[in-house]
């Protein structure tokens, strides 16, 4: 890792980690004032630690080159997107810290992620690596008491024990967040494309429960006030999102704590919303934010669906910057710059590159762990085509469990990766990452290929041929319920049930739309069955010049 020394170079490394290693090796770690001064001043003695190699995963993570004025809360916030932080050791004299995650998997995810995205605290890049030891034990010195109080405050809020969090925060924990407001003031600079209240909600809700949002224009700048359920979430969001762009080279977030401690929302509409009061009126005279802004900027309209619509990821999804790093069930797993699905869909609809993503312009995906006996270019074209216009597909000739899928642009590739990674296809969970290739090469004339490479650049089955297509507003994660459209009048419910059970799947529910019988919902026995049915039956000829359209539904029957 560039700029990072090994965690323990046996017999050669000296300093705070050496001291830490020696103490842990000999028993529970006790950082007394004497040993602290040793760590800060006496580096002369050689030390032989255990011989675990430097890159071996551990629950304990070593953080170096911290700013001298860093708080416990800021250090803890580095681990929050990846899981629960269970212990913290601050070595401020050395500008270092150790944090312990609740699982080795969470720690591994964190280290892998920060390997590709250098974290910055107070404008200073910091360095993260595995520690040489599996467990962190601390004493009750004043420094560690502050660290433990900070941890208690964060973990109490995460577990919903707000009363305990308040009492813990009342202790002088050295956390900046302890006395701060749960309300953030957000300014969006360089507003080239409209940013809606719903896009803000979906971005910021990854860091905690958003209670209220008010948007307004002041000094010719689009601004928002956003209230979290607790100050810890506000601190976490500010640290992660301040200075980031929502879209490529524009819509920069500037975030500060508001002097207000609570927001008073009178109307639920496009300018303000109280998520705790769905009964509030819309306010007839309140102008629609997305319409007025879209008109003012002449930009493609950013989707303004329900804040809950399309926001769910499958149980396993990829943090884009980590090139498809899989994060199972991470609470608040939106890492810095990761754009939620609805905002990504908005970007894709306007052909906007999502900023800050490793290979944001790369439209080629590497799909692995495929079933080589069953996968075909056509099946991948149909499945990935739910999230964008697939240009080319190549199943690797000598490794048929791997394929390259080229989308129309990087935003569509991000959408497909975030929604499909980890889902089962032909009985195997697929793994999706960004490829190092910039495009998929067609085979040369006379080159053996066995039909494993297909060019779909001019396919009539592309769902998103027009920039700003409304189909981008109907992109949802794979689910057991499918949305059917373009059904001719002669086709009955029974006909469709028979059709969808013909590939071995079980139909558990069906209903036509009341107002439009050309559309219906059908529920399969599992998400995997629904994925297979979509692949098999999208564009199926129903007669009378009607070809069935199949997509994943946000609704259930």
UniProtKB/Swiss-Prot annotation:
Domain RRM: 59-143, 184-260, 363-437, 480-555
Membrane-crossing segments per the record: none
Phosphoserine modified-residue sites: 16, 141, 459
Keywords annotated in UniProt: Acetylation, Activator, Isopeptide bond, mRNA processing, mRNA splicing, Nucleus, Phosphoprotein, Repeat, Repressor, RNA-binding, Ubl conjugation
Compartments, record wording: Nucleus
GO cellular component terms attached to this protein's record: nucleus
One GO biological process term: mRNA processing
PROSITE patterns assigned to the protein according to its UniProt record, in alphabetical order: RRM
Residues modified as N-acetylmethionine: 1
Modified residues (Phosphotyrosine): 127
Cross-link (Glycyl lysine isopeptide (Lys-Gly) (interchain with G-Cter in SUMO2)): 65, 218
Modified residues (Phosphothreonine): 138
InterPro entries with a match to the protein in the record: HnRNP-L/PTB, Nucleotide-bd_a/b_plait_sf, PTBP1-like_RRM2, PTBP1_RRM1, PTBP1_RRM3, RBD_domain_sf, RRM_dom
Disulfide bonding pattern of the chain: none
GO MF terms held by the record: mRNA binding
Record's keyword annotation contains Magnesium: no
Subunit structure, as described in the record: Monomer. Part of a ternary complex containing KHSRP, PTBP1, PTBP2 and HNRPH1. Interacts with RAVER1 and SFPQ.
Role noted for this protein: Plays a role in pre-mRNA splicing and in the regulation of alternative splicing events. Activates exon skipping of its own pre-mRNA during muscle cell differentiation. Binds to the polypyrimidine tract of introns. May promote RNA looping when bound to two separate polypyrimidine tracts in the same pre-mRNA. May promote the binding of U2 snRNP to pre-mRNA. Cooperates with RAVER1 to modulate switching between mutually exclusive exons during maturation of the TPM1 pre-mRNA. Represses the splicing of MAPT/Tau exon 10.
Record's protein name: Polypyrimidine tract-binding protein 1
């Amino acid at each position: 890792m560039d700029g990072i020394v090994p965690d323990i170079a046996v017999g050669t490394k000296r300093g705070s980690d050496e001291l830490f290693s020696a103490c842990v090796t000999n028993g529970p770690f006790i950082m007394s004032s004497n040993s602290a001064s040793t760590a800060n001043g006496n580096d002369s003695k050689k030390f032989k630690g255990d011989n675990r190699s430097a890159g071996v995963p551990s629950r304990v993570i070593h953080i170096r080159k911290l700013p001298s004025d860093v708080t416990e809360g800021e250090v803890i916030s580095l681990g929050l997107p990846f899981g629960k932080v269970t212990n913290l050791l601050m070595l401020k004299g050395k500008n270092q810290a150790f944090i312990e995650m609740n699982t080795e998997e969470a720690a591994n995810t964190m280290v892998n992620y920060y390997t590709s995205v250098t974290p910055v605290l107070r404008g200073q890049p910091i360095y993260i690596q595995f520690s040489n030891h599996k467990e962190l034990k601390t004493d009750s010195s004043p420094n560690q008491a502050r660290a433990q109080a900070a941890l208690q405050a964060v973990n109490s809020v995460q577990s919903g024990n707000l009363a305990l969090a308040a009492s813990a925060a009342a202790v002088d924990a050295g956390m900046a967040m302890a006395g701060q407001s749960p309300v953030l003031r957000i300014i969006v600079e360089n507003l080239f494309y409209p940013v809606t209240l719903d896009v803000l909600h979906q971005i910021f809700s990854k860091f905690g429960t958003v209670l209220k949002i008010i948007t307004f224009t002041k000094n010719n700048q689009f601004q928002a006030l956003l209230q979290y359920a607790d100050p810890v979430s506000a601190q976490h969001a500010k640290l992660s999102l301040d200075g980031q762009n929502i879209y490529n080279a524009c819509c920069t977030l500037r975030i500060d704590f508001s002097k207000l401690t609570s927001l008073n929302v009178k109307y639920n509409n496009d300018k303000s919303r109280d998520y705790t009061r769905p009964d509030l009126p819309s306010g007839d005279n309140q102008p629609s934010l997305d319409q007025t802004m879209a008109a003012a900027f002449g930009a493609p309209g950013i989707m303004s669906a329900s804040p809950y619509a399309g926001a769910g990821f499958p149980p396993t999804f990829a943090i884009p910057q980590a090139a498809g790093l899989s994060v199972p069930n991470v609470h608040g797993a939106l890492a810095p710059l990761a754009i939620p699905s609805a905002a990504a869909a908005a970007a894709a609809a306007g052909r906007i590159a999502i900023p800050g993503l490793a290979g944001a312009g790369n439209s080629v995906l590497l799909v692995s762990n495929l079933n080589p006996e069953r996968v075909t270019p056509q099946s991948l074209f149909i499945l990935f085509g739910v999230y964008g216009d697939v240009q080319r597909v190549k199943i690797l000739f000598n490794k048929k469990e791997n394929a390259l899928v080229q989308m129309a642009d990087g935003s569509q590739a991000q959408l497909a990766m975030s929604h499909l990674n980890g889902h089962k296809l032909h009985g195997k969970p697929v793994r999706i990452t960004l490829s190092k290739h910039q495009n998929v090469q067609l085979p040369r004339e006379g080159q053996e290929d066995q039909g494993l490479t297909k060019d779909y650049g001019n396919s009539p089955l592309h769902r998103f041929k027009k920039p700003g297509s409304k189909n981008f507003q109907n992109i949802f994660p794979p689910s057991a319920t499918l949305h059917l459209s373009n059904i001719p009048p002669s086709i009955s419910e029974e006909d469709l049930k028979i059709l969808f059970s013909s590939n071995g799947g079980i139909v558990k529910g069906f209903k036509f739309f009341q107002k439009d019988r050309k559309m219906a919902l059908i529920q399969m026995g599992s998400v995997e069955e629904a994925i297979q049915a979509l692949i098999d039956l999208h564009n199926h000829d129903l007669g009378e010049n009607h070809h069935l359209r199949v997509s994943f539904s946000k609704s259930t029957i």
